[in-house]
Amino acid sequence: MEKQVLIIINDAPYGTEKAYNGLRLANQLLKDNDDSELVVFLMADAATCAIPGQKTPNGFYNIERMIKALVLKGGRIKVCTSCAEARGIHNIQLVEGAELSTMSELAKLTMNFDRVLTF
């Protein structure tokens, strides 16, 4: 039976491991449940997770690669438009597969999905 999972991430890509752990769980859920629908919604400082080309030290996790892997598995990445704009993210290309979204869409996803997790 198909499950619908919404994961909301609020923290910046680096500094804490909330974005890392949210994306790690998202990737694992899709790997283990290929019939599930999964959406990651990036809010607040997490909107910066969708900026491509961020450099990380060798051996350190890379949020862009994690997002791309999630999209390849069929997951969707939504970025809060007002959160992105408040952080100067406008008129730039987002990580491949990420798309701008709204609070209205987040509200609909929250009401319609089976599970909602926050990081």
Where are these regions (language model features)?
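Short internal beta-strands
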Residues: A26, L38-A44, I77-T81
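A glycine-rich helix N-cap at a beta->alpha junction
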Residues: T56-C83
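Short glycine-enriched, charge-decorated loop/helix-capping segments at active-site entrances
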Residues: G53-N58, L94-E96
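Histidine-anchored nucleotide/phosphate-binding helix
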Residues: A19-D32, V40
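C-terminal structural segments of small proteins and small subunits
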Residues: A86-F119
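Extreme N-terminal starter segment of soluble prokaryotic enzymes
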Residues: E2-L6
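Short, glycine-rich nucleotide/cofactor-binding loops
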Residues: I7-G22, A50-K55
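Small/aliphatic-rich secondary-structure junction motif
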Residues: D32-A50
